[in-house]
């Protein structure tokens, strides 16, 4: 399994309705891209100085599934929308469920 994480810091002048539309469009990707095993998206709740504004965590069966998602036309539309309203975007993709990973339960 591969876990894909993306975080967005929106431009200061971007209205809340536009931010909500971005998150809604991200969440809708799971219904139209079959390679998505699971997807969670939402807004930052702590609002600390170091915080980004929203984030996405998606899980894919393998690298081929993640690559198919990456080039899917619906994903590319949302990527363009997100870039247009963001001052910063960061992402990381890592293998999950095998190898040197840890799960911590409290």
Q: Language-model features: where?
A:
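Short, flexible helix/strand-to-coil boundary loops that buttress conserved ligand/catalytic motifs
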Residues: 70, 79-82
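Short S/T/G/P-rich N-terminal loop/turn motif that feeds into the first structured element of a domain
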Residues: 1-53, 61-71, 94-106
